[in-house]
């Protein structure tokens, strides 16, 4: 076993780098004291959400309200002194300060009334902010303060009143803020600070993209969030592939957006040019019967003119047939995928207008394929090649999309482990016997955690491998497999029956059989085995998304004897009727783990104008027998390692192996 001095000598290169940040014994010792103090603070609050599906307004409101936590803080501070209506207004102000502030100011009859309102509001916000900041060090709160007004806010939040009058002191500062025309700015900054401090860490367990109107808004918000991680969903990886320039992924995401009349997001938000696709679609399919290609529409986002619907439907058909051709090509390139039964263009009887699905022949609902050569059905004609080239170029050159996908790669992964919780979107593929399913890729067998790790690594190839390389092509094909493959941990179903739903009337062909995982995860022993596979004790939790919990039918989100929590509660509007709710947030604080069940959100406009909040029901899953401290978390382990390194640095200074570059007045 090495002695302390031997360990320090071996680490001198690293310690010399550390000395750049702590150039003296005093600086290092001061940081040791601060870090050790952090270890004794309560653990920060973590929020877990999944399956946002582009529903930006509901997500923004839940993020702004911290899933109801902020309203709880308002009631704790003001419940005994302020009427319900005023508390609701104040909560809305915190959620939407820029939108709500002008409304509240307009109600003030004159300058004197406005000044009175300013004073009351600032003092109330300060009290609420002091409560939400109570778990944080003063240094941490200072770091969150805006530079323009940080000193004053720090004074308001942390002033002591042993020797002077609190009301007089606050009154003087607040009066000066109002007198100098800074009240609006301070109100907005306090609201933002309250939201910032209410939640320490945000976990998004997959599917930011899908049919919802503005996934780009969600990603913009997440990119500004102080601490977030993402576990990719199958809707996310196919967009990652599209951004990488994968033709099959591009066609897939466009097919989804067009089928829900959401291509405006693609064109206006990401700047993707669909003009060439529309021109080609009109040329070949403009006179077809487009009944089955009409998009699903949301009356809340209408109205839709016949011309709008036709444009969408004709592009929907064109991109779908292009997608079917490319699917066959990807399946041919990747026999490891074992998806040969999905090459439907080779299974069509062109003379009879039928298709073979699952060994049976079915009539097709649409038999117009003007761009398909029956002798070579997967070949692209010259027009399709041009359109595809333009689309790939447009996706690759979309600056905003590239920023979003780089963020997904930087903050995302197939699974994540933190503070005893295992997070993943879809499934750990299993057999009917309850063992981990084994699949072979590139000549090697993978199952359980090894399969998840392999999927993560190969997904990154698709974006980061050198341009034109076989590894990049392979990675992009695999991103598509993660979207819909039978043993994809992100999909977890036997097949994605897009073709059958469009072309075959018989509903029995539309079934997507769930992976056996979704039966076995009800068994506590299986959940414990999954946790053990990932190196976690049986007391840990699995946080899962992907499959909406049908609460209206009595289904519970708690599985496996409490070891697994499904947090897909149907954020997406289309699932509200199916689930009976509008999403979950799992909240893990220093005292409890609780699940908040959200009711449907009407609109941000109503929230601002009528102080309408999302109604949420809180269900305590576990109560800790003591308040969890930072030292008991993964962050605590990191901080202890930091303290160890800093102590080694101090010793290296004392031994003279590293020279101090600054002399501080200190006792060290």
Model-derived features with residue positions:
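Feature recognizes metal-dependent phosphohydrolase scaffolds
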Residues: 1-668
């Amino acid at each position: 076993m090495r002695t302390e001095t031997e360990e320090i000598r071996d680490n001198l290169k690293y310690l010399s780098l550390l000395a750049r940040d702590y150039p003296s014994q005093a600086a290092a010792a001061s940081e040791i004291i601060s870090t050790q103090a952090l270890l004794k603070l309560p653990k920060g609050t973590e929020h877990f959400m999944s399956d946002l599906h582009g529903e930006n307004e509901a997500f923004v409101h839940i993020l702004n309200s911290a899933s109801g936590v902020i309203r709880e803080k308002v009631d704790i501070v003001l419940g005994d002194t302020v009427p319900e209506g005023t508390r609701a207004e104040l909560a809305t102000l915190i959620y939407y300060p820029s939108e709500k502030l002008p409304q509240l100011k307009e109600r003030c009859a004159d300058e004197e009334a406005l000044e009175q309102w300013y004073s009351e509001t600032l003092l109330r916000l300060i009290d609420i902010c002091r409560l939400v900041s109570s778990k944080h060090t003063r240094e941490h709160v200072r770091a969150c303060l805006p530079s323009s007004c940080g000193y004053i806010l720090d004074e308001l939040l942390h002033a002591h009143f042993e020797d002077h009058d609190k009301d007089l002191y606050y009154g003087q500062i607040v009066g000066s803020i109002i007198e100098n025309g800074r009240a609006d700015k301070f109100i907005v900054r306090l609201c933002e600070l309250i939201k910032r401090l209410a939640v320490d860490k945000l976990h998004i367990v997959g599917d930011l993209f899908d049919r919802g109107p503005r996934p780009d808004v969600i990603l913009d918000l997440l990119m500004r969030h102080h601490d977030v991680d993402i576990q990719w969903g199958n809707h996310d990886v196919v967009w990652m592939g599209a951004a990488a320039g994968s033709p099959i992924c591009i066609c897939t995401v466009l097919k989804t957006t067009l089928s829900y009349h959401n291509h405006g997001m693609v064109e206006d938000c990401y700047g993707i040019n669909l003009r060439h696709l529309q021109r080609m679609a009109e040329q070949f399919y403009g006179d077809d019967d487009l009944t089955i290609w009409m998009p699903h529409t949301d009356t809340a986002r209408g109205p839709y003119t016949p011309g709008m619907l036709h444009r969408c439907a004709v592009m929907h058909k064109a991109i779908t047939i292009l997608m079917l051709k490319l699917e066959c090509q990807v399946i041919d390139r990747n026999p490891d995928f074992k998806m040969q039964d999905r090459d439907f263009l080779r299974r069509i009887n062109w003379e009879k207008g039928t298709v073979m699905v699952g060994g049976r022949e079915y009539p097709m609902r649409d038999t117009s394929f003007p761009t398909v050569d029956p002798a070579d059905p997967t070949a692209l004609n010259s027009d399709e090649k041009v359109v595809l080239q333009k689309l790939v170029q447009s996706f690759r050159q979309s600056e905003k999309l590239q920023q979003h996908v780089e963020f997904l790669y930087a903050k995302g992964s197939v699974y994540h482990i933190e503070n005893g919780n295992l997070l993943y979107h879809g499934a750990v593929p299993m057999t009917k016997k309850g063992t981990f399913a084994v699949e072979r890729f590139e000549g090697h067998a993978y199952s359980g955690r090894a399969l998840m790790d392999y999927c993560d690594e190969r997904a990154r190839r698709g974006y980061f491998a050198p341009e034109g390389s076989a590894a990049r092509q392979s990675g992009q094909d695999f991103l598509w497999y993660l979207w819909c493959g039978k043993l994809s941990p992100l999909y977890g179903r036997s097949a994605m029956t897009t073709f059958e739903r469009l072309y075959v009337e018989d509903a029995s062909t539309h079934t997507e059989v769930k992976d056996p995982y979704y039966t076995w995860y009800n068994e506590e022993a299986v959940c414990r085995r999954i946790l053990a596979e990932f190196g976690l004790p049986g007391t840990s939790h699995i946080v899962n998304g992907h499959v909406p919990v049908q609460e209206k039918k009595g289904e519970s989100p708690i599985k496996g004897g409490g070891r697994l929590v499904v947090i897909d509660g149907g954020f997406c509007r289309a699932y509200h009727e199916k689930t009976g709710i509008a999403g979950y947030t799992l909240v893990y604080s220093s005292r409890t783990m609780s699940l908040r069940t959200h009711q449907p959100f009407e609109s941000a406009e109503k929230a601002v104008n009528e102080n309408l909040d999302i109604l949420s029901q809180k269900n305590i899953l576990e109560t800790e027998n003591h308040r969890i401290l930072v030292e008991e978390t993964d962050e605590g382990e990191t901080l202890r390692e930091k303290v160890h390194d800093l102590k080694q640095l101090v010793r290296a200074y004392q031994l003279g192996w590293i020279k101090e570059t600054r002399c501080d007045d200190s006792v060290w």
